[in-house]
Amino acid sequence: MDDRMVDQSMHDEESSFELSLRPTKLRQYIGQSTIKSNLEVFIKAAKMRQEPLDHVLLFGPPGLGKTTLSNIIANEMEVNIRIISGPSIERPGDLAAILSSLQPGDVLFIDEIHRLSSVVEEVLYPAMEDFFLDIVIGKGEEARSIRIDLPPFTLIGATTRAGSLTAPLRDRFGVHLRLEYYQELELKEIIVRTAEVLGTSIDDESAIELAKRSRGTPRVANRLLKRVRDFQQVNEDELISIATTRASLQLLQVDDEGLDYIDHKMMNCILEQYKGGPVGLDTIAVSIGEERVTIEDVYEPFLIQKGFIERTPRGRKATPYAFEHFSKKNGKKE
């Protein structure tokens, strides 16, 4: 899968850029108002009791700020944070080394926590619940179990696939927070703030236009802004104008709904080749040259959210809205 302008996952070169944009306190965090309000209470109560915050599960689509929120939680609790990825913890010993290095109250953030292996996950249960580890040393008749006490800590797990978590792991999180797609006005505020960080200016109309095409995702909004800024600077414009914004996005193949060329390819497959469906995911994958799992995890969720396709027992089916929208796009009469 090529890097797409509207891909909600992080591109390799974006990590340092995203770090420079991240707020450090809840009051600076834009959007997710319900989550912010709840976290303010949970954090204040934990600090009043002089206890670590309860374990937190953050879930929702990629690019909505799960890592940012975990850093904010650590900052608000005034503790250190350790950030790791689920797939990088290959053996129980790896997890034991990480947990035993934590200081009292520290935050351990595990991204893609749904990808932990079952043997690693089982070691995590007593660590989360009672703050100890049972490690088996040796093999066969010489094997023995050693208990290691751990300092109280907060585990923050992040996942885009909450349904893939096992029930025992999911139930050990005291706080469950689902991040939702952002509203246009929230994205506009983020875009204006990012433009300031980048040392450029953008008018309100252009910021709204970018927000409309950002798939409800701050990461996409910031990526589009960076590319539009390139066009602005090459054109030697004083600020990012609506004319530059629209022309740039057209060249980037991002339409007014935030759909890119791959989205159009997938919708054309369903609408034109299979007359609106239903059509199976495997068939779509072969038709557009992508893997089934990529379609299911990356492309399809936004098309469903926009109301263009629906899942049925027999496969994916285009909605009446999709027929209307794409017939207009292609200049066809309904």
Curated annotation (Swiss-Prot):
This enzyme's EC code(s): 3.6.4.-
Keyword DNA-binding applies: yes
SMART domains from the UniProt entry: AAA
HAMAP family the UniProt entry points to: DNA_HJ_migration_RuvB
Family matches, as CDD domains: AAA
CC per GO annotation: cytoplasm; Holliday junction resolvase complex
Function field: The RuvA-RuvB-RuvC complex processes Holliday junction (HJ) DNA during genetic recombination and DNA repair, while the RuvA-RuvB complex plays an important role in the rescue of blocked DNA replication forks via replication fork reversal (RFR). RuvA specifically binds to HJ cruciform DNA, conferring on it an open structure. The RuvB hexamer acts as an ATP-dependent pump, pulling dsDNA into and through the RuvAB complex. RuvB forms 2 homohexamers on either side of HJ DNA bound by 1 or 2 RuvA tetramers; 4 subunits per hexamer contact DNA at a time.
Keywords: ATP-binding, Cytoplasm, DNA damage, DNA recombination, DNA repair, DNA-binding, Hydrolase, Nucleotide-binding
Protein name as annotated: Holliday junction branch migration complex subunit RuvB
Keyword Transport (UniProt): no
Residue sites binding Mg(2+) per the record: 67
Swiss-Prot/TrEMBL GO biological process terms: DNA recombination; DNA repair
Gene this protein is translated from: ruvB
Binding partners and assembly: Homohexamer. Forms an RuvA(8)-RuvB(12)-Holliday junction (HJ) complex. HJ DNA is sandwiched between 2 RuvA tetramers; dsDNA enters through RuvA and exits via RuvB. An RuvB hexamer assembles on each DNA strand where it exits the tetramer. Each RuvB hexamer is contacted by two RuvA subunits (via domain III) on 2 adjacent RuvB subunits; this complex drives branch migration. In the full resolvosome a probable DNA-RuvA(4)-RuvB(12)-RuvC(2) complex forms which resolves the HJ.
Species of provenance: Staphylococcus saprophyticus subsp. saprophyticus (strain ATCC 15305 / DSM 20229 / NCIMB 8711 / NCTC 7292 / S-41)
Database matches in InterPro entries: AAA+_ATPase, AAA_lid_4, DNA_helicase_Holl-junc_RuvB, P-loop_NTPase, RuvB-like_N, RuvB_C, WH-like_DNA-bd_sf, WH_DNA-bd_sf
